[in-house]
Amino acid sequence: MIEVKGVWFWYEEGKPVLKNISLSFDEGILAVVGPNGSGKTTLVKMFNGLIKPKKGDVLVDGINTKEASTAQLSRIVGYVFQNPDAMFFEETVFDEVAFGPRNLGLSEEEVKERVKWALEAVGLKGFEDKNPFKLSGGEKQRLAIACILAMNPKYLVLDEPTTGLDERGVGALKNIIEELRKEGKSFVIVTHDMDLVLEVADKVLLLSNGEVQFYGDVFEFFELDLKRYKLEEPELVKICRGIGLKPVRSVEELLRGIGL
């Protein structure tokens, strides 16, 4: 479980970025949304110790992040940065994915097994000898996820994962998230992509001006006035609202809802 207890944070004294944030998240898929500058990335970087609270505490499976290293926490919470290139430094895809497990001190045989599983999970089997920097944007995003998967964390934090991806790349990402959910992985996804939120999220955390504006069920979230927070409703939500239906995830659900 990830527990946030009365957390405050500032980069500059007197200008808090996060103000008394409290919440708990156990499993499933949590979307973290809000306007630019609302504190989203600052908050989720606390989940694996990249940033420490100024006040309050963040506990990950009972471990206070103030008392643990990022290396220790990375076994529980993996972080995929918005720009995957920032994560890469090896010359082959295999060595890139193997880097984390090797640092854990695993045998080379177990490292190979983890790399094989992670690459298959993200659809990059056969890419082992390719140069990470020569992959497409979507392939780089999948490789970044594979690098984290190979560490076998309980939670994966994805920071704006659809940025720069075309429709095909976004579709592949959604499939990966759904498949890994079935295998027991949980996700925290920072995003402006409301279609992604509608299709995959269980819960939504809405931040604005460093404060929690909403934390709860995804369908309840889409009943809010999102324009107030400079967020764009998915077309499907607009249609549901227009005909007096509660939000649904797919066109198929919409058709069933109107009896077709």
From Swiss-Prot:
ATP binds at G34, P35, N36, G37, S38, G39, K40, T41. It is found in: Cell membrane. GO terms for molecular function: ATP binding; ATP hydrolysis activity; ATPase-coupled transmembrane transporter activity. It is an enzyme of class 7 (translocase). Its EC number is 7.-.-.-. Belongs to the ABC transporter superfamily. It is a peripheral membrane protein. Its main location: membrane. CDD domains: ABC_cobalt_CbiO_domain1 (cd03225). Residues 2-234 form the ABC transporter domain. InterPro entries: AAA+_ATPase (IPR003593), ABC_transporter-like_ATP-bd (IPR003439), ABC_transporter-like_CS (IPR017871), ABC_transpr_CbiO/EcfA_su (IPR015856), ECF_ABC_transporter_ATP-bd (IPR050095), P-loop_NTPase (IPR027417). Probably part of an ABC transporter complex. Responsible for energy coupling to the transport system. This is Putative ABC transporter ATP-binding protein PF0068. One of its GO terms (cellular component) is ATP-binding cassette (ABC) transporter complex. It comes from the Archaea. Pfam families: ABC_tran. It comes from Pyrococcus furiosus (strain ATCC 43587 / DSM 3638 / JCM 8422 / Vc1). Keywords: ATP-binding, Cell membrane, Membrane, Nucleotide-binding, Translocase, Transport.
